[in-house]
């Protein structure tokens, strides 16, 4: 048989029909076998009903996006055929439940193979329509040419806590589905994916990686309010709070969540909260207070489509302006974004370090595509990012204070960063409010002190880009035709587009931005100057990231945008077409 490097499998139907669980079983098994995976769920903002799909890209080498096209489409309804049939590549397969009497007429004369098979009827032979997804799993395994044993072992383990009868019926449903496809295919050969050999890897959500990263950073306190697409961070923390000795507070709203997390930070712990766009709006006043009080808190903002409730289950990168400017006054804070699901783990640890090193709020901004989808990544190194608590004082090192003097918590230092104490430290007493203050934290409205403290709060941020890698550098050309810059989940599609341009002899450099605020203009300028054109790739309608470039960079005329705001992730072709327009 011919060997391939990857394939894309997709299953669709109505929410609540077991589509996600079918995909999860397949993905979990293949991840254990060493395949590199990227999964994507598309679903409506409702509990049950409405069209949904689960797509899985399976590859021999690491993939950073869901890719384009579909090789194997498994459909439980006609809607899936109508909506996604055009994605199926030549030589690909569509299997649809014969119960819906599928219409394949638009595929006549094409090289797409269409099979109408009795998925529901086969499930009912085992006594329940709930087994349709297991029948579909068996069909998929037959199409993909995988060994059945590992899947059957997984099914047996999944239902082991139930009766042996349930286990046997699910195994029979799997065998029936497998047999139907094998009988239909006969001697037809399908390209298969060779076994890569087992790897030391994990398969997890970006949100789970964020939670794991927070734990690795030493955080044991979280206050949050559930919101799509960020809730999984809190759910993971709650699931593991007992073994961690952690405290998780589900508050009544996002304002309370932010203030509660600030309270934990004030008390000396590494506290954080997690939200999405609507919640970030509610946190604006609290974040401004955290900036004034120089409290090192972390806010995870998993970006979704807006404005308002928007499309809560669709991807967008439209919180950039809100993260940078939402808090009132001259707000001093840091905004960073991970470039991959793997970086959700490592960069969130750096977010906690930055917060304490610079004593300010840090907003950590993955997007929905990262937060709610899974990718296989090398097993995390818990020791890669050492904990840095900045100028945290030890009680033994504090000089004696003569009452009623307070500790100079907001001392006007050369680098703008003051020594920090926490409540309870002898000789470390200070005031902390949202009011402008003097060095001891006492309210002060003298013009000179306000200017001095404001300058101090911004002066300390001048070295952020020197102490943090502001972007992922994929720029290999000293002189480039185009520089492409993206953020968050766009990385995979951009890298695939750039790789094709390399093969075509077009010089395209690529940077994936991590540091959004303070904007790393100095570090970006050499790459900017070395390119004839600059294309900013972002998921919003107004070019929010592009505007940051135009505000901060020279030679603005060379900048253009590649915008996408339909709720779907970037693809290689979409990015490539945008680059071609400026060549």
Where are these regions (language model features)?
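Active-site cofactor/cluster-binding pocket
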Residues: 1-217, 221-223, 533
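Thiamine diphosphate
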Residues: 3-85, 221, 228-325, 334-355, ...
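Gly-rich Lys/Arg/Thr-decorated short loops/hinges at beta-loop-alpha junctions or inter-strand turns
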Residues: 6, 159, 183-199, 214-219, ...
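Flexible, glycine/charged-enriched surface loops at secondary-structure junctions
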Residues: 40, 150-151, 163-171, 184-193, ...
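Short gly/pro/ser/thr-enriched loop/turn and capping motifs at secondary-structure boundaries
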Residues: 44-47, 101-104, 122-123, 231, ...
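Short beta-strand segments
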Residues: 75, 97, 118, 275, ...
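A short, gly/pro- and small-residue-rich
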Residues: 83-101, 291-294, 545-563
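Flexible, low-complexity linker and terminal segments
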Residues: 203-210, 215, 352-583
């Amino acid at each position: 048989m011919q060997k391939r490097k990857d394939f894309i499998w997709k299953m669709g139907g109505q929410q609540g029909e077991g589509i996600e669980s079918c995909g999860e079983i397949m993905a979990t098994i293949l991840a254990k076998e060493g395949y590199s995976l990227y999964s994507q769920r598309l679903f409506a903002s409702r509990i049950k009903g409405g069209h949904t799909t689960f797509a899985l890209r399976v590859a021999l080498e690491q993939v950073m996006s869901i890719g384009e096209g579909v090789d194997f489409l498994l459909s439980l309804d006609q809607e899936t055929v109508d909506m996604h049939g055009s994605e199926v590549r030549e030589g690909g397969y569509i299997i649809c439940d014969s119960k819906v009497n599928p219409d394949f007429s638009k595929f006549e004369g094409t090289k797409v193979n269409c099979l109408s098979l009795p998925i529901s009827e086969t499930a009912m032979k085992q006594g329940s329509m709930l087994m349709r997804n297991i029948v579909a799993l068996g069909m998929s395994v037959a199409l993909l040419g995988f060994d059945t044993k590992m899947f059957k072992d997984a099914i047996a383990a999944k239902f082991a806590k139930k009766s042996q009868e349930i286990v046997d019926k699910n195994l029979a449903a799997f065998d029936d589905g497998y047999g139907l496809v094998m009988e239909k295919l006969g001697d037809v050969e399908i390209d298969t994916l060779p076994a890569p050999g087992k790897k030391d890897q994990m398969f997890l959500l970006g949100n789970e990686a964020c939670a794991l990263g927070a734990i690795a950073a030493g955080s044991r306190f979280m206050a949050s309010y559930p919101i799509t697409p960020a809730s999984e961070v809190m759910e993971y923390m709650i699931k593991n709070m007992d073994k961690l000795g952690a405290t998780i507070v589900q508050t009544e709203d996002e304002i309370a969540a932010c203030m509660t997390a600030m309270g934990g930070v004030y008390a000396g712990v590494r506290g954080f909260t997690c939200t999405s766009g609507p919640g970030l709006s509610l946190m604006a006043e609290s974040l401004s207070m955290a900036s004034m009080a120089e409290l090192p808190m972390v806010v995870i903002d998993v970006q979704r489509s807006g404005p308002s409730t928007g499309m809560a289950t669709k991807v967008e990168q439209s919180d950039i302006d809100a993260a940078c400017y939402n808090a009132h006054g001259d707000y001093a804070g840091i905004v960073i974004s991970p470039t991959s699901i793997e970086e959700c783990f490592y960069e969130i640890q750096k977010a906690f370090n930055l917060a304490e090193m610079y004593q300010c709020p840090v907003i950590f901004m993955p997007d929905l595509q990262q937060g709610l989808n899974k990718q296989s990544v090398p097993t995390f190194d818990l020791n890669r990012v050492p904990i840095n608590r900045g100028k945290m004082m030890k009680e033994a090192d504090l000089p004696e204070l003569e009452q009623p003097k307070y500790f100079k918590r907001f001392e006007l230092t050369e680098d703008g960063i003051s020594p920090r104490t926490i409540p309870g430290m002898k000789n470390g007493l200070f005031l902390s409010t949202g009011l402008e203050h003097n060095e001891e934290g006492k309210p002060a409205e003298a013009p000179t002190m306000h200017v001095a403290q404001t300058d101090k709060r911004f002066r300390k941020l001048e070295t952020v880009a020197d102490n943090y890698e502001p972007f992922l550098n994929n720029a290999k050309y000293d002189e480039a035709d185009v520089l492409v810059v993206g953020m968050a989940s766009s990385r995979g599609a951009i890298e695939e587009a750039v790789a094709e341009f390399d093969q075509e002899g077009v010089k395209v450099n690529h940077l994936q931005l991590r540091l959004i605020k303070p904007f790393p203009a100095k570090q970006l300028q050499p790459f900017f100057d070395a390119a004839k054109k600059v294309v900013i790739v972002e998921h919003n309608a107004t070019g929010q990231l592009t505007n940051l470039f135009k505000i901060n960079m020279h030679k603005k005329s060379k900048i253009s945008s590649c915008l996408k705001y339909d709720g779907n992730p970037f693809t290689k072709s979409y990015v490539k077409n945008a680059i071609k327009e400026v060549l």
